Amino acid sequence: MPINIRRATINDIICMQNANLHNLPENYMMKYYMYHILSWPEASFVATTTTLDCEDSDEQDENDKLELTLDGTNDGRTIKLDPTYLAPGEKLVGYVLVKMNDDPDQQNEPPNGHITSLSVMRTYRRMGIAENLMRQALFALREVHQAEYVSLHVRQSNRAALHLYRDTLAFEVLSIEKSYYQDGEDAYAMKKVLKLEELQISNFTHRRLKENEEKLEDDLESDLLEDIIKQGVNDIIV
């Protein structure tokens, strides 16, 4: 299914907040999303799709939909809006919320960014969406804001996220911050140095093409070997 990744806008923040509430225990007020988008409009990204045949438990319950009362009507009708949809036929399936470090106590630090939140709807996971969102954000931080490094926090229990950050995106674990989250769970504090030449999106496009070619070669070799074995068995039977 086609997935489109683009910069997040103010028009996306209701759907971004909905995805956050739907998937993560760390939640934010609407104004915090607005602060990110208005202050660093190039840094945050959303993933959307117009192919809507992948609907299951992630779909909003009727009680979760937003109610809108229509003014100027005689019967005072209300309609329910699905907050997963950015527009008719366009559904948000993931986002990454990013900012530059604006801590006044760290003004002497070189320019650096922070990954505030990353979320992908459950039905659309294991498709590389989170990795693509992150790579776009890292490239934007370096190219647009000249960030020298980026930081984030991740729950110790979140093995999938840790694998993405550490093994796929080459973040390093700096420390363990005790009771970082409201429920008392510890967090890994992670950091990645940003080098523009390593972050070029084309690098990873070529890598994926090569991986696909290698997989195709492996499949062809496997099919050829299977044919040879079958032919050998047939010769023995004859």
Curated annotation (Swiss-Prot):
PROSITE patterns: GNAT. InterPro entries: Acyl_CoA_acyltransferase, Ard1-like, GNAT_dom. Its EC number is 2.3.1.255. CDD domains: NAT_SF. It comes from the Eukaryota. This is N-terminal acetyltransferase A complex catalytic subunit ARD1. Keywords: Acyltransferase, Cytoplasm, Transferase. Pfam families: Acetyltransf_1. It comes from Saccharomyces cerevisiae (strain ATCC 204508 / S288c) (Baker's yeast). The keyword Acyltransferase applies. GO terms for molecular function: identical protein binding; protein N-terminal-serine acetyltransferase activity; protein-N-terminal-alanine acetyltransferase activity; protein-N-terminal-glutamate acetyltransferase activity. Belongs to the acetyltransferase family. ARD1 subfamily. It is found in: Cytoplasm.
